[in-house]
Amino acid sequence: MERTCLAVILAAGDSTRMKSSKSKVLHPVAGRPMIAHVVEAVASAGISSVALVVGRDAEEVAKAASIDGVGIESYLQKDRLGTGHAVLAARDAIAKGYDDILVTYGDVPLQTDAPLKAARQGLADGSDIVVIGFHSDRPTGYGRLLVKDGELIAIREEKDATDAERTVTWCNSGLMAINGRKALDLLSRIGNSNAKGEFYLTDLVEIARSLGGRVTAVDAPEIEMTGCNNRAELAVIERFWQERRRREMMLAGVTMIAPETVFLSYDTIIGQDALIEPNVVFGPGAVIDSGAVIHAFSHIEGAHVSEGATVGPFGRLRPGADLANGAKVGNFCEVKNGRIGEGAKVNHLTYIGDAVVGAGSNIGAGTITCNYDGVNKSETVIGENAFIGSNSSLVAPVTIGDGAYVGSGSVITADVPADALALGRARQEIKPERAKLLRERALAIKAAKRAKA
């Protein structure tokens, strides 16, 4: 029978060091609140449910933690009396009787499921407590994990450690797995006879051992256990997340010419043999199919780029943009809620918003779909194999038929039938010698101003 598991995520801190008007767990990593990364990690570890311990910004934190397929209940920690007290805020959830209890933190967004699964396996193998640790070249400030004969005998805080114990490099991450059938009994035994009068979760090690229980530890990469307390640490976490995800993509067949300049979102999907040039930013909701090319300095969010399509350089795709196979959106072009048909070209200095561009059509430089009247958005439909001349304005709602031509500089306010030529501009006039007269008049005005000065 599969073991049941409750994940208790502690996210009730005051976040004072973040210097922010909102809880630190709401700050994004790769375009997603860090608390959501934590929920995803515990979900991948096979948990049955999540108990989210909240304090500041409780409603916002609970909303940010919500991801599909994961049952979450929130529990308010009114007073901040230590980690042991925080876990007991979820007493009602723990009392439901799970095999395993995983305790983790909402400000550790780089954690993965591997050490969480290892901790759960430790419980399955007979441990009552499994602490997740990490080895560090700079252990100063961390509690040390002291192990003897394969069991964890103590977590020694820096200030209490002997000189010999300070040489230990295996450190306490704070993450822990607890035998769910014994959890409430163990947690209720934590006291607060310390200088701060707080209830420390780490006391469970000695409590469990004093009752004859087995306590062990498992290892995790140090970077995955990194907590986020300020903006500098947030930047470090963002950098590592990006490095890890870029490497995964490149090993899966994506070419990145200068990967350190490419920034991905938590849900970015890029297919095999796609080419990503330098200085490209992907916001949430970007899907890039196999063989697509994203040229330098492009920004893509909420958009789909099909096989063989190209974007940029300096292209921007906003939510709802959808490029069909072989479509091109070139330099200094923006597409928002627009479908660009197969082989269609939008090559220069163009805005396509709330529009459909048919297959094989060519949109000239400087073309604007005028989709907003100050109140409502309207749609522009351009048929297949149409040609829109440069510097044209298409005032929506309007339809340009298949094979139609729009002359350069036109302002189109009415539908254009298929294969028709539309001209929406004033007729050119030539006035001989008029430029000379205008120039002479301007020079005379200038001279008069100088004479008065």
From Swiss-Prot:
Pfam families in UniProt: Hexapep, NTP_transf_3
Active site: H348 (proton acceptor)
Annotated region (N-acetyltransferase), positions in chain: 253-453
Annotated GO biological process: cell morphogenesis; cell wall organization; lipid A biosynthetic process; peptidoglycan biosynthetic process; regulation of cell shape; UDP-N-acetylglucosamine biosynthetic process
GO annotation, cellular component aspect: cytoplasm; membrane
Alphabetical UniProt keywords: Acyltransferase, Cell shape, Cell wall biogenesis/degradation, Cytoplasm, Magnesium, Metal-binding, Multifunctional enzyme, Nucleotidyltransferase, Peptidoglycan synthesis, Repeat, Transferase
Reactions performed catalytically: alpha-D-glucosamine 1-phosphate + acetyl-CoA = N-acetyl-alpha-D-glucosamine 1-phosphate + CoA + H(+); N-acetyl-alpha-D-glucosamine 1-phosphate + UTP + H(+) = UDP-N-acetyl-alpha-D-glucosamine + diphosphate
Binding note for cofactor: Binds 1 Mg(2+) ion per subunit.
Binding sites annotated in the UniProt record for UDP-N-acetyl-alpha-D-glucosamine: 10-13, 24, 77, 82-83, 105-107, 143, 157, 172, 229, 318, 336, 351, 362
General function of this protein: Catalyzes the last two sequential reactions in the de novo biosynthetic pathway for UDP-N-acetylglucosamine (UDP-GlcNAc). The C-terminal domain catalyzes the transfer of acetyl group from acetyl coenzyme A to glucosamine-1-phosphate (GlcN-1-P) to produce N-acetylglucosamine-1-phosphate (GlcNAc-1-P), which is converted into UDP-GlcNAc by the transfer of uridine 5-monophosphate (from uridine 5-triphosphate), a reaction catalyzed by the N-terminal domain.
UniProt subunit comment: Homotrimer.
Protein name: Bifunctional protein GlmU
Source species of the chain: Rhizobium etli (strain CIAT 652)
